[in-house]
Structures are given as structure tokens and as C-alpha cells.
């Protein structure tokens, strides 16, 4: 396992950052505590603090400690502790002002009929409704893991902690020290095998560490792990983070391991949480639910539209397929399959979105709206300057070598802190403030190694080493480095009033006889936390084994599917080869058939040609015979001439006869033109007929009548 990155900070950066440290010291802020907290601090340990301020002069130069790394850890813990104080104090005051104006803004919105997420006040105090760089709207937030929801539910269900049982409560003489309530450490999962991997001691077994697999960007040369060991007495607050990895995790809502401290703060009353997790804003929840309902309705309408479009495509395909030929049907089918596949993919995506929105709606109805970064920490640069000033003031009692070591570690620490914290959402800051009560409490952490007896300091240091000792370290050097970090976290200089080194309050705390029992109790809690971590590791191993089994099963199924596909491919190949063989055989048989048919056709054509030649020969013979007959008919030409002349004579006679007939007809025709002529002609003919018939009688009569005389 790798060592902490803070142990690897070298002294060669000291000269580089010396000027920056001196500039940061010039911005040392004054007393920035609220009146309630100042009163509580004075009421809890007023006599002790006054006595310590009077009895503790400004310490002179001390001898150089034997281990420079331990002193560097002390200075780093003091620096970042006071920086967190000034960082979260201003944020807490702004949250209080926002909380005071929330009721008036809500009433004003109800009177005007404005929606809950459209009002500027609600946009200012509800980070979920902002459009920030992490998610464009509330409904584009990534769904939090169910394990993290369980942790938040358990945190919300815990009772409020009174400040009366603070760690700083002590007697006036310092001999009768009371055992304080121990706080749990809240930590984020360090990246890439940090030595502070989930080293925390929760009291509640249900708040065990939740290991979450998360892929983050690889470390660059400029990003360093920042290990913050904030210790009050024998309590260890471990905040191990990686600048880019943790920023990505917090942006995505992947807060890995959170635990609520049992009690921390001054003796002036209960810890004041700005916005309790258990009581979300009902109007904001209602607005989120309404917005999700609108999105669900919109997605449902889109699904209906896509389904109707797909049905129309099917109907159009059937209509076109009935009126097309085979080639057009194949083309139409390809186009339809593409359209159908695209619409199916669109419908599947819409269904996924619908299920996602329904899960988020159910989650919001159960746990309230999920948090989102409201504002970037605007005063982070000033806080970092205050950190440098506080480090300079806190380590003023040490030798020049200590200052050089702190200067060397300040550059990398401030760079990593600025990179990590500025990119974090506001939820991370509020969670840290809820865990530690108020960030101002860090200023009350004193250094037991400054003014106490050497044996008490050694005992406190050994107790801290006992607290952080764990089999997770690979060597004694790493363990000693972590021990120095744990002990140094309690040596916060405190830049506020009364924040001088070597406070008698801390000496009384660490010199009390009851601290041994408290240390044993803390060690017991750490062992319990380690057991919880081991259980979580076992659960993770079980999950990994389950995933491995599932992947193995999937691989076996894919292998079986691959074998089946290979068998099908082999069968298809054999079938293809058989079909090719059959085609070759059919081609050979067809060739034989074509050759036979062509031979038969040629033979038929030959026979037809021979028959034609025979007919031509017969015609030639007939023509020759006719020519012979014609030659024989020339001899009878005279007889034929006589016959012709006789026929001509007969024709001439017939012509003469016809002339006579025509002449007679010409005489008769005028007599037959009218009815009168026809009648007279008929009578004349009858008379002539009668005369011809009685001609003998008429002649006899004429002879006897006319010729009697």
C-alpha cells in the first residue's frame, strides 16, 4: 500500500513558496466567531482559557523536534483546520440569512401564483433548481445509489446532539477531567491505495463504510492526495481526498462513505444544522415531483407518437408490398426494416427514460429532492490566504527548520486544496459542516506538545499513534507518519482571539487521568469500525464474486452460442457445398440434353432438306414432260387453224342474225312506248293474226263478192 502523499512533500518547495507564505500572513483575519459560539466557549472553559492566556507567555524558540515529518504533519493539520473554519463560517452565515428570508419569499410566491422553481429566492436557496455545470436541471441529475440513500436516511433519523457534552468541557484545576463524547470520523474514500483507506471508527454499525467502485481520471503530476487529520484530543477526523477524483465523485453524487459524529462543538447548546436532511423543503419537493410528472407525460406522448408512426409504417409497407413485384418488395422490405429498427430503438430509449424518471420520482417521494451544487465557493482564494496566514501564526513557536518544512508543504497542499474544493458542489461543504458541527470548533483544537509536560506530550503522541495504528500500513515509517499526522491534527494554532499555542485547556484535556479510558474507548470504536470495514469488504468481495459468476455464466452462454453458431455455419457450408455439387450435376445433365436435342434437330433439318430436293427434282421432270408435249402439238397446227376459221364463220353468222333481230326490235320499239300504242299495236297484231288465220275464207269471199260480175 502506498504512503500518504502528504508524507512525500519535500522541503525543496519551501524557498519557492516562502514569499507566498509571508503574503498570506499579512491577511490574517481577526475574530470571526458568532456571539453565541464565543459565549459558549467562554462559559465552558472560561477560567481555564483565562488562566491559560495569563500563564502562557509567547513561547521562545524551542529545540528542533527529532522527526521533521511529524512537525510537518502538525503544521498541515493546523493550516487546513483553520482554513476550513474560515471557509465554512461565511457559508454558514449566508445560509442562515437565506433561511431567515425563506418564509417571506414563500408567502410572496404563493400570493403571486408563481411556481416554486421560477422564483429568484427559491433559485438562490435551492441549489437543485439551478442550471450549473454538473447537471442542466433538477431532472437531469444522476440517480444516487441506493446504498447512499440508506446512509442519508440513517443520518436523518439520528437525534440532535447537545453541545453540553463537548470535548472541551474541563474543570478549573484541570485535575478532574471528564470523559467526552467521542465523535465519529467522516471520510471520503481515498483513491488509488492511500494509506488512509477508510480508517474511521463509527459508533453505529448501520453507518458502515460503503465501498463504491468509481472510475476517475488518472492522476497527473500536478494533482496530489490531500490527507487532513483533524484531531481533538484523541479523536481523529480523517478527510482523505484526491483533487480530481473526489471532485468527479462529488459532482456525480457518489459520496462514498459518510458517518455522523456523536457530538462536537462548544458547550453553548445543541449543534445548529442549517438545512436538516430529514426535513426537505415541501414546495421544492412538490415542484420537483410536478416537473417529473410533466416529463413522464411528455415521454409517454412521445412513445405513443413513435408507436403510431411505427404502425403507419407497417400499414404503408403492407399496402406497398401488395402492389409491387418481387424486386420492389425486397427493396421496400429493406427500407421498412431500417425504419422499424430505428423506431424500435427510439421507443426503447424513451422507455428507458420513462423508467429512469419513474425511479427518480419514487426516490424523491421517499427521500426528498436530491441536492445539487448551488454556488461555487466564492471565497475559496481568501480562505487559502487565511490558511497561509494561520499556518504562519500557528508555527511561529517552532524553529526555522519547521517553517521551511511547512513552506515546502504549503505549495502542493494549497494547489491540491484549491483544485479539489473549488470544483466541489455546495452539498459537500454542508455535509462537512453537519459532521463537525461548526467549522469554528476547529479553532479550539490546541497543541498538547507545546506547553504541557514532556511526559504528557509523549503520552498524547503515543495515544494518537495507538489510534491510527492499523495493519493497513506496510511499514513502521508509514505508521509513524500517520501517527504524526493524527497528533498534529490536534495542534491547530487557532487564529481567533485566544488562539495562542499551548493553551492550558488542551493541557488539561490531554493531562487528565480519564484520557486513558477515553483512548481505550476510541481504540475500541476504531476496532469496531475496522470490523465494519471488513464486513463491507466481505460484502464487496461477495458482490465481485457474484459479478464474476454472472460474467462467467454470460461468457459460457456466449461460448455456447458461439459453438451453436459455428455448428450452424458448418451445416450451412456443407449444405452450400452439396448444392454446388448438385448444380454441377444438373449442368452436366442439361449439357447432355442440349447436345442430344441439337443432334435430333439437325437430323430433322437434314431430312427436310432432302425432301425439298426430291420435290424440286419432280418439278423439273414435269416441266420437261410439258416441253415434250408442246413439241408434239406443233404437228397438229393446221387442224387447229381450220378449226379456228370455222369458229370465226359461225361467229359471223351469229352477228348477222343479231343484226336482223335488232332491226326488228327497232321497228317494234316505237309502237310499244305508250299504253295507247301498245293497245293499238296489239289490236293490229290480232287483226293481222285473224286475217292470216281466215285468209282462205277472205279470199273466197272476195272472189265471190267482188268478182261476181
UniProtKB/Swiss-Prot annotation:
Entry's transmembrane regions: 649-669, 682-702
Bias kind Basic and acidic residues: ranges: 115-131
Bias kind Basic residues: ranges: 83-94
Annotated Gene Ontology cellular component terms: endomembrane system; endoplasmic reticulum; endoplasmic reticulum membrane
Stretch list, region Disordered: 1-143, 158-202, 444-500
Positions carrying Omega-N-methylarginine: 163
Keywords: Coiled coil, Endoplasmic reticulum, Membrane, Methylation, Phosphoprotein, Transmembrane, Transmembrane helix
Residue stretches of biased makeup (Low complexity): 44-57, 102-114, 480-490
Gly residues biased stretches: 491-500
Function field: May be involved in the regulation of the proteolytic processing of the amyloid precursor protein (APP) possibly also implicating APOE.
Stated family: Belongs to the TEX28 family.
PANTHER family: CEREBRAL PROTEIN-11-RELATED, TRANSMEMBRANE AND COILED-COIL DOMAINS PROTEIN 2
Protein name listed in UniProt: Transmembrane and coiled-coil domains protein 2
Source species of the chain: Homo sapiens
Amino acid at each position: 500500500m502506498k504512503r500518504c502523499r502528504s508524507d512525500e512533500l519535500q522541503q525543496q518547495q519551501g524557498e519557492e513558496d516562502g514569499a507566498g507564505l509571508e503574503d498570506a500572513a499579512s491577511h490574517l483575519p481577526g475574530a470571526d466567531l458568532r456571539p453565541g459560539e464565543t459565549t459558549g466557549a467562554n462559559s465552558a472553559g472560561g477560567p481555564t482559557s483565562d488562566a491559560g492566556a495569563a500563564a502562557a507567555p509567547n513561547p521562545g524558540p524551542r529545540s528542533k523536534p527529532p522527526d521533521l515529518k511529524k512537525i510537518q504533519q502538525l503544521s498541515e493539520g493546523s493550516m487546513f483546520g483553520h482554513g476550513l473554519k474560515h471557509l465554512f463560517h461565511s457559508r454558514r452565515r449566508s445560509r442562515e440569512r437565506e433561511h431567515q428570508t425563506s418564509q417571506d419569499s414563500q408567502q410572496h410566491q404563493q400570493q403571486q401564483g408563481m411556481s416554486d422553481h421560477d422564483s429568484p429566492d427559491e433559485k438562490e436557496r435551492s441549489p437543485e433548481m439551478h442550471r450549473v455545470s454538473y447537471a442542466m436541471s433538477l431532472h437531469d441529475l444522476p440517480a444516487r445509489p441506493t446504498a447512499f440513500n440508506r446512509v442519508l436516511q440513517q443520518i436523518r433519523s439520528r437525534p440532535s446532539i447537545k453541545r453540553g457534552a463537548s470535548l472541551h468541557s474541563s474543570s478549573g484545576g484541570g485535575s478532574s477531567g471528564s470523559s467526552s463524547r467521542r465523535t465519529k470520523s467522516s471520510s471520503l474514500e481515498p483513491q488509488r491505495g492511500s494509506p488512509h483507506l477508510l480508517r474511521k471508527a463509527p459508533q453505529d454499525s448501520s453507518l458502515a463504510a460503503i465501498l463504491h467502485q468509481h472510475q476517475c481520471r488518472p492522476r497527473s503530476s500536478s494533482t496530489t492526495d490531500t490527507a487532513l487529520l483533524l484531531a481533538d484530543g484523541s479523536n481523529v477526523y480523517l478527510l482523505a481526498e484526491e483533487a480530481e477524483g473526489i471532485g468527479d465523485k462529488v459532482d456525480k453524487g457518489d459520496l462514498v462513505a459518510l458517518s455522523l459524529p456523536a457530538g462536537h462543538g462548544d458547550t453553548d447548546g445543541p449543534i445548529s444544522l442549517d438545512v436538516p436532511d430529514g426535513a426537505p423543503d415541501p414546495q421544492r419537493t412538490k415542484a420537483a415531483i410536478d416537473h417529473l410528472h410533466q416529463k413522464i407525460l411528455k415521454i409517454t406522448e412521445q412513445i405513443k407518437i413513435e408507436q403510431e408512426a411505427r404502425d403507419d409504417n407497417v400499414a404503408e409497407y403492407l399496402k406497398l408490398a401488395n402492389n409491387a413485384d418481387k424486386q420492389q418488395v425486397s427493396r421496400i422490405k429493406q427500407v421498412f426494416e431500417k425504419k422499424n429498427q430505428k423506431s424500435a430503438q427510439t421507443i426503447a430509449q424513451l422507455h428507458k427514460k420513462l423508467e429512469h424518471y419513474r425511479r427518480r420520482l419514487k426516490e424523491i417521494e421517499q427521500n426528498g429532492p436530491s441536492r445539487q451544487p448551488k454556488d461555487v465557493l466564492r471565497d475559496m482564494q481568501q480562505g487559502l490566504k487565511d490558511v497561509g496566514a494561520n499556518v504562519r501564526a500557528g508555527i511561529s513557536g517552532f524553529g526555522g527548520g519547521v517553517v521551511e518544512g511547512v513552506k515546502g508543504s504549503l505549495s502542493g497542499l494549497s494547489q491540491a486544496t484549491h483544485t479539489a474544493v473549488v470544483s466541489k458542489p455546495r452539498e459537500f461543504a454542508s455535509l462537512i459542516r453537519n459532521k463537525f458541527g461548526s467549522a469554528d470548533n476547529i479553532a479550539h483544537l490546541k497543541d498538547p506538545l507545546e506547553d504541557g509536560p514532556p511526559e504528557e506530550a509523549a503520552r498524547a503522541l503515543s495515544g494518537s499513534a495507538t489510534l491510527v495504528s492499523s495493519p493497513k500500513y506496510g511499514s513502521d515509517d508509514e505508521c509513524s507518519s500517520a501517527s504524526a499526522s493524527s497528533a498534529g491534527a490536534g495542534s491547530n494554532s487557532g487564529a481567533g482571539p485566544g488562539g495562542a499555542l499551548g493553551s492550558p485547556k488542551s493541557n488539561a484535556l490531554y493531562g487528565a487521568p480519564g484520557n486513558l479510558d477515553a483512548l481505550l474507548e476510541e481504540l475500541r470504536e476504531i476496532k469496531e469500525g475496522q470490523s465494519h470495514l471488513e464486513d463491507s469488504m466481505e460484502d464487496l468481495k461477495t458482490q465481485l464474486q457474484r459479478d464474476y459468476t454472472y460474467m462467467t455464466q454470460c461468457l459460457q452462454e456466449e461460448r455456447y452460442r458461439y459453438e451453436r453458431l459455428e455448428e450452424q455455419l458448418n451445416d450451412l457450408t456443407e449444405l452450400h457445398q452439396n448444392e454446388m455439387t448438385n448444380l454441377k450435376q444438373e449442368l452436366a445433365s442439361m449439357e447432355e440434353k442440349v447436345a442430344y436435342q441439337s443432334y435430333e434437330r439437325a437430323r430433322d433439318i437434314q431430312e427436310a432438306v432432302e425432301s425439298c430436293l426430291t420435290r424440286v427434282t419432280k418439278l423439273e421432270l414435269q416441266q420437261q414432260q410439258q416441253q415434250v408435249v408442246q413439241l408434239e402439238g406443233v404437228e397438229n397446227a393446221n387442224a387447229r387453224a381450220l378449226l379456228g376459221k370455222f369458229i370465226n364463220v359461225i361467229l359471223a353468222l351469229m352477228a348477222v342474225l343479231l343484226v336482223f333481230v335488232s332491226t326488228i326490235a327497232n321497228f317494234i320499239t316505237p309502237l310499244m312506248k305508250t299504253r295507247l300504242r301498245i293497245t293499238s299495236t296489239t289490236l293490229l297484231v290480232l287483226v293481222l293474226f285473224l286475217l292470216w288465220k281466215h285468209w282462205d275464207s277472205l279470199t273466197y269471199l272476195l272472189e265471190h263478192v267482188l268478182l261476181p260480175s
